[in-house]
Amino acid sequence: MEPTYCSRRHHQGKDKGKEVLDRKRQVLHLVTQWTTLYRDFLREDEHVKLFMKTLYRFLLDDLYEYPTLEKEQKDLQKLLRLHRRHTAEEYSPHRKSKALSHQLSLKENGLPTRRTQRETREVLCHVYVSMDSYLSVRSLASVVAQGLLQEVAERLDVPLEELVLLAVTYPGEKLLLKPQDRLYSDSLTAVGRLHVCRKDLSEVMNPFTDNAELQQRSARMLSMNTWDVAVTLTNFDWSVFNSVHEQELVYFTFSRHASGGHTVALELLLQRCNEVQLWVMTEVLMCPTLCNRVQLIKKFIKIAAHCKAQRNLNAFFAIVMGLNTAAVSRLSQTWEKVPGKLKKVFLELEMLTDPSLNHKAYRDAFRKTKTPKIPFLPLLLKDITFIHEGNKTFLDNLVNFEKLHMIADTVRLIRHCQEDHMGNGMPQKSSPEVQAYVDYLHVIDNQQTLFELSHRLEPRV
């Protein structure tokens, strides 16, 4: 792009000069649109920053010969957040030496640094508190061991001084983390699987299958209002979804193994979807009494319906899938006692998750849902992956723009879902008690443990 902008082709006369000016304008317009659309992603790329500086330098050089480019210069200046105002007169040949020093001093303090961007990103920390369960803690990526340990201690009601934080690396090595150790790298890779232990390295709590106290936790869930739970789930999801940029879907699909931290919000929402599904399973399977288990299933059906009403299809899918997993759906004695009216409601909700005809039921319902709304992201990613893998990016050494247009149309759905032209609004006021519970989900992620609990509740005949 730089050679295209800089090329003068030794033009002669007015027509050639106008042609060069038009070409420069076209390049600057393209760069401005590109930078405006993908600003946050581009600002973290050192190559892009260097390119933008170089282009701006060339533009400043051209101001004397093409003073009508001053509007484009101001637009680019705003994008770079330069504090100093440059004018065409300032870049005349007589002031070239002084100009050069200013050209090379684009105000770096106007550009967010990688560290600043990193420190404002959020992650879901999975902190294992037993062999088969973890506590989910939403935190900044800049969190240190002491800060995370303090949050976990408060949630578990265990004195902080009794706990330590371990990171278990891929080879199985256990690292004892110091209070000020950072838990995430610049690319948001965790130092390892995080475990909270007592100082003698014993477990903080027994496994769920042997923990009588944890098996009484259903009482807390049963006391909560279903609408409040749905509101809290939606507020959490919306706060993340509203920060998802459509470019994240492209990074996730095209360069999943080298995203460089560019898919943080998207991965957070996908992680949350999986977490909510596990939470539904955990709550039902940790309830030892039949009558309470029936009440829990009734509550989750209502919460799923409320999430749908609140236009949160991501949480809606997660709850329905959680109730439909083999470990929960096999509890025939429990499902038999669910009232017929609620069974009918659940059947209608299930129909929306039916994958037949390429999820036609969901797509039709979602199309009719007003914005803002949260889509079921795994399906959206599946659509993009299908386009990407089913079509070549290059045909006869030329870019396949038809493929790129199809991907663009699909990812543009993110922006559409985030729009709120009618003032419908997504976040609502939630109960502090419910928020404290839902924002820190304690779930079992071990499928063997979940099935063991299921068969313990209703043994195979």
Predicted regions and their residues:
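Intrinsically disordered, low-complexity regions enriched in proline, serine, glycine
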Residues: 1, 12, 38-46, 68, ...
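Alpha-helical solenoid scaffolds in large eukaryotic transport, assembly, and signaling factors
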Residues: 1-47, 136, 160, 228, ...
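Interface signal in eukaryotic adaptor modules for cytoskeleton, membrane trafficking
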Residues: 2-31, 165-180, 184, 332, ...
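Alpha-helical scaffold repeats of the Armadillo/HEAT/TPR superfamily
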Residues: 3-5, 45-60, 75, 170-172, ...
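Residue-level signature of the C-terminal ends
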Residues: 4, 33-41, 45, 58, ...
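Residues within HEAT/ARM-like alpha-solenoid scaffolds
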Residues: 15-29, 43-50, 67-74, 143, ...
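Intrinsically disordered, proline- and charge-rich regulatory regions
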Residues: 22, 61-125, 150-151, 161, ...
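Intrinsically disordered, Pro/Ser/Thr-rich cytosolic linker and juxtamembrane tail regions that serve as
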Residues: 66-268, 272-274, 279-286
